[in-house]
């Protein structure tokens, strides 16, 4: 194959011209003198149409019939070089169609397991390496890519430096019961839950830093919102107030949504996502409500006919039904701020004048997607942090480097983290987080 290849997504620039595309056959139909071939190349889906009379006219009867017969016998997922004239077609969702003039088979495909019929979730997950080729799964991956691209763009534009934290560590950032342990030359080591502790060191050196990478939680959870391995963006910054941190988080989430609208509009269309809702989340300010006000609100509405959550007292933590109700009540992404210190991490700074509450926030996404961001101001006073660790019975020797940060020029600082898969699930409008990552790792799944 010597002709220059173009991507399907670029065919709009070649209307009326003959082009060659390297693609896979997603589906095929037609009868008699016409064949329709659904093509995909990773950038988009595209329909090609082959007319038998045109092949006979161009190649002669014997060669023309032979070439047309090859097209008629194509199997799903056969890889091909296909050549044709790009034409505008208002009937097509893509807006264009390919009048096929030639086709060369690259790799045959026989008995492809994921046929156009309905399949069960377990079957599709067992064949995840193939399921990724489907239209909707490709769309989700394109949205994921847009979110990752927009993450780097946003932090670069806001003066942050990429700072890579280690994946192996001898201590936990938060809950030590959720760690995956491994042997590190005869000593115990743990897969990272978060890069936050190391990012705080980065913030003391570079001012504003972020990292992006895989993290691991040994949670024995089978909900639609949990993975044991997922990708996290953590950001840390010095000399920023709590309110300024919330402003930054809001701007970041809006930038991610806008990035998907700009870079993956066809993916949103394939998934039938409510684009107007996404635009509204950008246009309207996010709501901010204190934890205690949220509890009061839940108590006031728990007898309503449309509520489905358990009663909570002040000091109780939210469950998913409570988060869903709160975000749906306000109708836009909602920050719940100043949670009780009793169930938050040791490093969070208390609210001035109220040591039972901490300067933190969870961002709850509407439409039932729940928490997508968690963040806080960090305790920057050495003595206060040591006292908190002693209260919790923590081994301070495991956090000597972390305590050092408070001994040598400590400053007000904070940070937040976002699970990329939760953000992908929210923006894409998918029902389960397992579709937001190429190869999900869950309680009972570690392959393919």
Swiss-Prot record:
The gene is asnS. It is found in: Cytoplasm. This is Asparagine--tRNA ligase. HAMAP family: Asn_tRNA_synth. GO terms for cellular component: cytoplasm. It comes from the Bacteria. Homodimer. Belongs to the class-II aminoacyl-tRNA synthetase family. Its EC number is 6.1.1.22.
């Amino acid at each position: 194959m010597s002709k220059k290849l173009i991507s399907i997504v670029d065919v709009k620039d070649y209307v009326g011209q003959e082009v060659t595309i390297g693609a896979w056959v997603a589906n095929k139909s037609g009868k008699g003198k016409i064949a329709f071939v659904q093509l995909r190349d990773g950038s988009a889906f595209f329909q090609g149409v082959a007319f038998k009379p045109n092949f006979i006219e161009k190649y002669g009867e014997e060669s023309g019939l032979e070439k047309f017969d090859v097209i008629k016998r194509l199997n799903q997922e056969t890889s091909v070089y296909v050549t044709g004239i790009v034409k505008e077609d208002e009937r097509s969702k893509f807006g264009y169609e390919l009048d096929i003039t030639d086709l060369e088979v690259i790799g045959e495909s026989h008995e492809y397991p994921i046929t156009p019929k309905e399949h069960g979730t377990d079957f599709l997950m067992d064949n995840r390496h193939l399921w990724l080729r489907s239209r909707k799964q490709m769309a989700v991956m394109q949205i994921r890519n847009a979110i990752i691209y927009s993450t780097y763009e946003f932090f670069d534009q806001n003066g942050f430096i990429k700072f890579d934290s280690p994946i192996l560590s001898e201590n936990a950032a938060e809950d030590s019961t959720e760690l995956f342990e491994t042997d590190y030359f005869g000593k115990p080591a743990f897969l990272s839950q978060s890069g936050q502790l190391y990012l705080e060191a980065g913030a003391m050196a570079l001012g504003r830093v972020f990292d992006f990478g895989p993290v691991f939680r040994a949670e024995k959870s089978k909900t639609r919102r949990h993975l044991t391995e997922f990708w996290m963006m953590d950001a840390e910054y010095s000399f920023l107030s709590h309110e300024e941190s919330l402003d930054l988080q809001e701007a970041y989430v809006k930038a991610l949504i806008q990035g998907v609208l700009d870079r993956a509009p066809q993916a949103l269309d394939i998934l039938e996502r409510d684009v107007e809702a996404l635009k509204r989340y950008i246009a309207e300010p996010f709501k901010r409500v204190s934890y205690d006000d949220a509890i009061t609100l839940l108590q006031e509405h728990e007898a309503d006919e449309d509520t489905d959550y358990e009663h909570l007292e002040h000091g109780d933590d939210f469950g998913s039904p409570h988060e869903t109700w709160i975000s749906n009540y306000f109708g836009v992404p909602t920050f719940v701020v100043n949670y009780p210190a009793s169930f938050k991490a040791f490093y969070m700074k208390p609210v001035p004048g109220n040591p039972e509450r901490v300067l933190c926030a969870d961002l709850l996404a509407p439409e039932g997607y729940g928490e997508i961001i968690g963040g806080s101001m960090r305790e920057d006073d050495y003595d206060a942090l040591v006292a908190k660790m002693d209260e919790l019975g923590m081994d301070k020797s495991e956090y000597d480097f972390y305590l050092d940060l408070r001994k040598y020029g400590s400053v007000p600082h904070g940070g937040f983290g976002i699970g990329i898969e939760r953000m992908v699930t929210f923006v894409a409008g998918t029902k389960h987080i397992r579709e937001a990552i190429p190869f999900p790792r869950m309680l009972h799944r570690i392959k393919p």
